[in-house]
């Protein structure tokens, strides 16, 4: 059996996520947008909770097409609040719409979301030395700077810890443990 990061466990959905997504550099702006929104949904919860609901989020939020999401109304959020496939936390659901509007405002100003995000790591993944999971930080100076810059651009639910989890999952930072099959 291949060695994996200890947080993965035995659930196939988690193994697949770890092996095929987590820590793999992603440069597609819309996929990065989806992930920053989903990371915001995780606040106070475990990632597996959000991962199990990801397809329901994609369906409810137009596959995270920022143009369509930005047009969602209060009535759309009311419907989302009735959707058992989502985390029914109004502020978190509204955050996705707010973040879509912030994303589009960046685009309107000529700022590409992928270039913006990757600029925090000089457009190169940071490969960390991770002998064991205990050395992995919850946030860094880089995630603090990203959080501040996103908030300045009107993004919400993008704190330092959320930004670091985003950086890990999207491959800006590789925090797979040394010896992991995905390192």
Protein language model features and the residues they cover:
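HhH-family (HhH-GPD) DNA N-glycosylase catalytic core used in base-excision repair
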Residues: 1-183
């Amino acid at each position: 059996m291949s060695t994996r990061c200890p947080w993965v466990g035995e659930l196939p959905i988690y193994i697949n996520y770890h092996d095929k997504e987590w820590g793999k550099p992603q440069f597609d702006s819309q996929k990065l947008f989806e992930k920053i929104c989903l990371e915001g949904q995780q606040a106070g919860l475990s990632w597996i909770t959000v991962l199990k609901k990801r397809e329901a989020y994609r369906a409810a939020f137009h596959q995270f097409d920022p143009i369509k999401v930005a047009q969602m109304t209060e009535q759309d959020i009311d419907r989302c609040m009735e959707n058992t496939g989502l985390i029914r936390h109004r502020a978190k659901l509204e955050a996705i719409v707010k973040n879509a509007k912030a994303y589009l405002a960046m685009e309107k100003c000529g700022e590409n979301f992928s270039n913006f995000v990757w600029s925090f790591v000089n457009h190169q993944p940071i490969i960390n030395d991770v002998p064991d999971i205990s050395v992995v930080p919850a946030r860094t100076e880089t995630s603090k700077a990203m959080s501040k810059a996103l908030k300045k651009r009107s993004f919400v639910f993008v704190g330092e810890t959320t930004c670091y989890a985003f950086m890990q999952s999207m491959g800006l930072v590789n925090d797979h443990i040394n010896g992991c099959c995905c390192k």
